[in-house]
């Protein structure tokens, strides 16, 4: 039974907190939390809920607002009293509500929240468990709640968290309707009385609450006034103070005459300090996403974007939409101008899309809301259907969220397509976020086709401009069945590559893919617009050819068959096979890879991975094919030499040298570059006419025991067969 104490006419009742609530308060008061600021968010959120309730009731019964039409939240710091007061004109609480809601009936979330806290959850999740009010004790030693409901008298609730609270009828200043929460702050929490700190917390957590939040501050300003004005001021001030105590009014008898007679004289002035109450609305940026997109200017979107992201630049593009029907939500999505430096740092929590439920902020890093490849998109999603107390675990299972995610991805792709029509801006977008689009092609099979339309590449015919795959297809020759591409390190490198010689000479366009992620992208993007994507660096490249060309190719195959066999014998396991090439024009040979193996570029990328899987490296790298150019004089002369004497040591040496050089020109790395270099140096010496034996005789100390013997040496040939 509550204790009853009689204070004159006032009846004060004391109640014990329900055990779980007492335990929760003890936990809040006695544990150190770094982000105490969330108490303000919780109290504002509660005020907003109370305002939502009265607004909802007034829809069916407008007279409910007779006790106060204005729906608002006021914040009043009082440094002299060390109190921070929050006032709302919401629905208020009856005496029974006050006793039940603030202490005697535990919410279902109380126990769950304590368990979560003890398991390491953040205190900021308190609101999700419906016990946000108690976060006031993070900063306050005593809390007083004065409340007035339309159906009851005005009551005051008070507690210093000692296991009990009191409730009494309140005969102080009438508040009309709503709730006033007065926090008596702890000595070390006075920062929440500072204008800067309150504004900072409201901006961070509550700037998009749907009701005006006004900060009331007592300020001083200097006022310059003439002496006679000073007298007037004094008179006015005394008039104002008359309510408090009767004071004689000062009259300036004859001041008018003095004024008139002294018009030409310079008036004496003095500065006085006057106190005034400054009112500032802290959330002027109303939830912009709830408004009609047609009524919002680009400047307003820009302001909202900057306040949301703290970016100093304007956004590049914006998509504002709402979805209605079985599911209702609104979203406002922005593309920034630049990619953040840590765009693909997985360990860093991204807070790009803020999730609201009916205008109340829920969380700012909701991974389930958007796929990773769109992690650069900034904005807000406001759902009407999700429950307010939703937790991260529930989000992962939520069907509603899956539908929202699907819609967001769809709208993002629409936004990119719209942006693609503006060449200048799309160029900026593509420079910043092309990796994301390519990652999307790798990961998102559903939207792969739409994403592929957004890709832009340099090609052998596009010059300095980048071109889309659609434009490439529109320029294809009638006989051309495939889209030809080459991957590599730079545009210059791939443009001068031996692989593109014949393709370009025949007038076919080649797409230049020069980013490491392109390799992953084309593994998934097998075709575009019904045309298969074919790498010019892999085996089986088929170029459209007429009967004459086919006949010539057959003749070359027969003519060079023996040389191919010999080269395969010499190179042994280094290559899978040696064939005649249909892709070379001016280069003597090149190394191609098998259709499903890695390209040279992919091999380079994989070797650079710090955490690579060596077992995969083995079988993906192994398949190399040497292709020789039948029209090249080096190859023709080598064929003649081999036919004259297939055991000629020079032939073996030249075959290995050709192979190693082809490895380099095809983008591979050598396993033993030193041996290759020594061979080249010998060739240079031969070219310069330097006698190897003379040099060795002059510098006996420099002779290394296992130095490579002269080019024609027997040993050298056998040694070269072992070297890759």
Swiss-Prot record:
Residues 215-552 are annotated as: Interaction with AHSA1. Pfam families: HATPase_c_3 (PF13589), HSP90 (PF00183). GO terms for cellular component: aryl hydrocarbon receptor complex; cytoplasm; cytosol; dynein axonemal particle; extracellular region; melanosome; nucleus; perinuclear region of cytoplasm. The modification N6-malonyllysine is found at residue 399. The modification Phosphothreonine is found at residues 297, 479. Gene3D superfamilies: 3.30.230.80, 3.40.50.11260, Heat shock protein 90, C-terminal domain, Histidine kinase-like ATPase, C-terminal domain. InterPro entries: HATPase_C_sf, Heat_shock_protein_90_CS, HSP90_C, Hsp90_fam, Hsp90_N, Ribosomal_Su5_D2-typ_SF. Residues 9-231, 264-608 are annotated as: Interaction with NR3C1. The record marks 126-127 as: Cleaved under oxidative stress. SUPFAM superfamilies: ATPase domain of HSP90 chaperone/DNA topoisomerase II/histidine kinase, HSP90 C-terminal domain, Ribosomal protein S5 domain 2-like. The modification N6-methylated lysine is found at residues 531, 574. Ubiquitinated in the presence of STUB1-UBE2D1 complex (in vitro). One of its GO terms (molecular function) is unfolded protein binding. The keyword Chaperone applies. In the resting state, through the dimerization of its C-terminal domain, HSP90 forms a homodimer which is defined as the open conformation. Upon ATP-binding, the N-terminal domain undergoes significant conformational changes and comes in contact to form an active closed conformation. After HSP90 finishes its chaperoning tasks of assisting the proper folding, stabilization and activation of client proteins under the active state, ATP molecule is hydrolyzed to ADP which then dissociates from HSP90 and directs the protein back to the resting state. Belongs to the heat shock protein 90 family. PANTHER family: HEAT SHOCK PROTEIN 90 FAMILY MEMBER. NCBIfam families: PRK05218.1 (NF003555). The TPR repeat-binding motif mediates interaction with TPR repeat-containing proteins. Molecular chaperone that promotes the maturation, structural maintenance and proper regulation of specific target proteins involved for instance in cell cycle control and signal transduction. Undergoes a functional cycle linked to its ATPase activity. This cycle probably induces conformational changes in the client proteins, thereby causing their activation. Interacts dynamically with various co-chaperones that modulate its substrate recognition, ATPase cycle and chaperone function. This is Heat shock protein HSP 90-beta. The gene is HSP90AB1.
């Amino acid at each position: 039974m509550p204790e009853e104490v009689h204070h004159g006419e006032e009846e004060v009742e004391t109640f014990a907190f329900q055990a779980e609530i007492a335990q929760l308060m003890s936990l809040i008061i006695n544990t150190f939390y770094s982000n105490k600021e969330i108490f303000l968010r919780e109290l504002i959120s509660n005020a907003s809920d109370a305002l939502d309730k009265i607004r909802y009731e007034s829809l069916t019964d407008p007279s409910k607002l007779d006790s106060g039409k204005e729906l608002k939240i006021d914040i009043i710091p009082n440094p002299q009293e060390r109190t921070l007061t929050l006032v709302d004109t919401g629905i208020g609480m009856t005496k029974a509500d006050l006793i039940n809601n603030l202490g005697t009936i535990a919410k279902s979330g109380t126990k769950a929240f304590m368990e979560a806290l003890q398991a390491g959850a953040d205190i900021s999740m308190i609101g999700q468990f419906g016990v946000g009010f108690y976060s006031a004790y993070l900063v306050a030693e005593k809390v007083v709640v004065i409340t007035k409901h339309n159906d009851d008298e005005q009551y005051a609730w008070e507690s210093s968290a000692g296991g009990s609270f009191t409730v009494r009828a309140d005969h102080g200043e009438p508040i009309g309707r709503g709730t006033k929460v007065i926090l008596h702050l702890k000595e070390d929490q006075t920062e929440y009385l500072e204008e800067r700190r309150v504004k900072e917390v409201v901006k961070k957590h509550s700037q998009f609450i749907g009701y005006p939040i006004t900060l009331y501050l007592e300020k001083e300003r200097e006022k310059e006034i003439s002496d006679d004005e000073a007298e007037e001021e004094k008179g006015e001030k005394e008039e104002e103070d008359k309510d408090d105590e009767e004071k004689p009014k000062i009259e300036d008898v004859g001041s008018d005459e003095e004024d008139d007679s002294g018009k030409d004289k310079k008036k004496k002035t003095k500065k006085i300090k006057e106190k005034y109450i400054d009112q500032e609305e802290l959330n002027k940026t109303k939830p912009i996403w709830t408004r009609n997109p047609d009524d919002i200017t680009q400047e307003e979107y820009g302001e909202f974007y900057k306040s949301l992201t703290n970016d100093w630049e304007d956004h590049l593009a914006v998509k504002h939409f709402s979805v209605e029907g079985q599911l209702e939500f609104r979203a406002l999505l922005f593309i920034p101008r630049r990619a953040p430096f840590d765009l693909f740092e997985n360990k860093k929590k991204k807070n790009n899309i803020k999730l609201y439920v009916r205008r109340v902020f829920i969380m700012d890093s909701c991974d389930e809301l958007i796929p990773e490849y769109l992690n650069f998109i900034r904005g807000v999603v406001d759902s009407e259907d999700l429950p307010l107390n939703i937790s991260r675990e529930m989000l992962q299972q939520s069907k509603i969220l899956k539908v929202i995610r699907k819609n967001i991805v769809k709208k993002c792709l629409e936004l990119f397509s719209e942006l693609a029509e503006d060449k200048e801006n799309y160029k900026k977008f593509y420079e910043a976020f092309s990796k994301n689009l390519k990652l999307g092609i790798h990961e998102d099979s559903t939207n792969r086709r739409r994403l592929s339309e957004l890709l832009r590449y340099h090609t052998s015919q596009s010059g300095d401009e980048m071109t889309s795959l659609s434009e490439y297809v529109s320029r294809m020759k009638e006989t051309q069945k495939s889209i030809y591409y080459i991957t590599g390190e730079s545009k210059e490198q791939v443009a001068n590559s031996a692989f593109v010689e014949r393709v370009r000479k025949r007038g076919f366009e080649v797409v230049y893919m020069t980013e490491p992620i392109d390799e992953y992208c084309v593994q998934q993007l097998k075709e575009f617009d019904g045309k298969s994507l074919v790498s010019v660096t892999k085996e089986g490249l088929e170029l459209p050819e007429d009967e004459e060309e086919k006949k010539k190719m057959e003749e070359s195959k027969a003519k060079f068959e023996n040389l191919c066999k010999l080269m395969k014998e010499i190179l042994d396991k280094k290559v899978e096979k040696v064939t005649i090439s249909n892709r070379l024009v001016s280069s003597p040979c090149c190394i191609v890879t098998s259709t499903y193996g890695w390209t040279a570029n992919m091999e380079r990328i994989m070797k650079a991975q710090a955490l690579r899987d060596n077992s995969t490296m083995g079988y993906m790298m192994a398949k190399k094919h040497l292709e020789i150019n039948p029209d090249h004089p080096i190859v023709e002369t080598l064929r003649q030499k081999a036919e004259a004497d297939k055991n000629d040591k020079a032939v073996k040496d030249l075959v290995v040298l050709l192979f190693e050089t082809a490895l380099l020109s095809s983008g591979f790395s050598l396993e033993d570059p030193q041996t290759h270099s020594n061979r080249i140096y010998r060739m240079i010496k031969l070219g310069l006419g330097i006698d190897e034996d003379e040099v060795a005789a002059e510098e006996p100390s420099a002779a290394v025991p296992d130095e490579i013997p002269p080019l024609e040496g027997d040993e050298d040939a056998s040694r070269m067969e072992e070297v890759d």
